[in-house]
Amino acid sequence: MQDISKSIEACAARYGEQATAMRDYLVAGQDAALALDNRGPIEFDASGKLAQHILDAYSKYGFYVFTGVLTEEECEDIEADMVALKASFPVAPDSTVDAEGRPALGSDSLTPHLVWSKPLGDPLGGTQLANGRHQVKMFEPQATADTPTASPFILLGSLRFSDACLRTYAHPELLRVAEAINGEDFAPFNEALFIKEPGIGAAVSWHQDGVTHWDSPDFDENIHGFNFMAQLYGSTAVNGVWVLPGSHKLGKIDIKDLVSSSKSERIEGAVPLVCDRGDVVICNRQALHGSFPNSGFEPRLTVNFGFHKRSSVLRVKGGGIHSDAQVFDDEIIARRSRVLGYAIAARKERFPEETAYEYKPFTKRSLSFVWDDAARADIHDYNRDDLSI
């Protein structure tokens, strides 16, 4: 694990009179996270099923840290793509050109792609954005004078922009985990990159991701799906996501009341997702989670992608957060799933020694995919069909 003692001090120092409380919270949270029994490599039993102790821990806590999933080679591929992506970012939120005057990344998009924030800000908390699910505003520390006025902290539709992220999306062991949790006909959700630069990265206020099924008669702990969070530089108590263990089973939570009872945004019992480079977290979308502004010295780059049970999205009207609200029929789900087919093909080309994942809905329809220029054109604005619930 990374030594983040200097980052803890730097972060706490920005909280003024609450510095000691913040320092204690970060240290205690890190210790509590590492004491949980929900960390280790992906394991399957003799019959090929996901190990029962992983299923049990995921059900108990609402998240599990899979260690050492991405090889150094794969991490380096993502890193190289990130250098190119950042160079192509627009120079400002309302700009269509990059620093070299070229058309900026996503300038021809019909869908949202970059979410911006002021340094160390909380652009979502306490607003009606994302259906108002970010109920409270996080503390926004004062950034230093040399930081930009705004910077991107989320890239949506990331598989279109990064071949390396597309290939990670098709990681065979992760897809086997998705099948174990959501069934062999699991459906895609949404993909994004979360960019938390040191001294700049924005907060994401406490929230639960699900919006559609809270009052469903079929409600269960997995009805809103999950996200995989692959960590390029690791994840810490300072720059990482915090989760309230077990909260995925509690239904819709009154976050304002919880913050009030905790007497601050430092929610009691929450723990950070502590990860090393190449680790991947599976996190239930119903779990209460959020992150503080990155006031430390370590960057975080999270390759985020999620999956649903097909029964959670088929003939269901979407929540309208990641895409326009629409009723998801078989055609829409199939159209949105084609990105997975291209991802499997792209990964097979890059890592031919691996046994590629077999996605049963493709097999049943005798579908095959090739990753080429035509495929690249086919996934332009693919996230218009994000299965957002």
What are these regions (language model features)?
Residues N190-L193, F228-A230, V303-F307:
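A structural signal for short, well-ordered beta-strand segments
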Residues N222-F226, Y233-F292, S312:
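Double-stranded beta-helix
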Residues D163-L166, V177, W214-D218, A230-L232, ...:
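Short helix-to-loop capping/linker segments positioned immediately adjacent to catalytic or ligand/cofactor-binding
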Residues Q2-K60, T67-W206, T212:
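Non-heme Fe(II)-dependent double-stranded beta-helix
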Residues V136-F139, Q208-V211, K256-G269, P299, ...:
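Short, surface-exposed loop/helix-turn segments at secondary-structure junctions
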